[in-house]
Amino acid sequence: MSDDDRRRWNKKYAEAAPAELLQADEWLIDAVEGVPPGRVLELACGLGENAVWLATRGWRVDAVDVSAAGLHAASQLAARHQVTPRLIAADLDRFLPLPNSYDLVVVFRYLDRHRLPELVTRALVPGGLLVHETFGPGQCDRPDNHLRNPAFVLAQNELPELYGQLEVVRYEEAVLPDRSVGRLIARQPAG
């Protein structure tokens, strides 16, 4: 990620209003229902809502983002909810998780077609879950579209193909009130 990207994200997150309520993404809430807490890695955690929500439910969270402003907001949110996720300032172009270390990897609103499959499969333990949701088909056609680069939007059925080495548990493409998405829950093969 370039320094311009880092500055852009810092500016965006510095201007964001602090979260009043702790609200995780619905896809994540559904995906982890009934899953016993373990170690989780959130990539591109932004303001930290998902990371903090997971920590309040007993998960041991490592949350990574390039933006110091986003991580500062995540730290404040965590303090308000009396949890301590480990917040890691890192560029995902260079970040390398320990192998076979996480029961769950979470990615929302982020897409790096080359790097993410490698990071996720490296990080997950056998049987571990990936929960990934990002902008999907139709996003660029929406009147409320804010994306500047269509390269950050999935093609139809692209997300399961990116993670071809994982077992698909559930995949869908959906039009939500504020965005179009591709959503995947996938499992690292057990052996």
Question: What do the predicted segments below correspond to?
Answer:
Residues 1-35, 38-46:
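Conserved class I S-adenosyl-L-methionine
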Residues 60-65:
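Conserved SAM-binding motif I beta-strand of class I
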Residues 67-69:
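Conserved SAM/SAH-binding beta-strand->alpha-helix loop
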Residues 81-92:
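Conserved SAM-binding strand-loop segment of SAM-dependent methyltransferases
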Residues 97-104:
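A short acidic, Gly/Pro-enriched loop at the edge of an enzyme's catalytic core
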Residues 111-123:
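A short, conserved alpha-helix within the catalytic core of class I
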Residues 127-135:
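Conserved beta-strand signature within the Rossmann-like core of class I S-adenosyl-L-methionine
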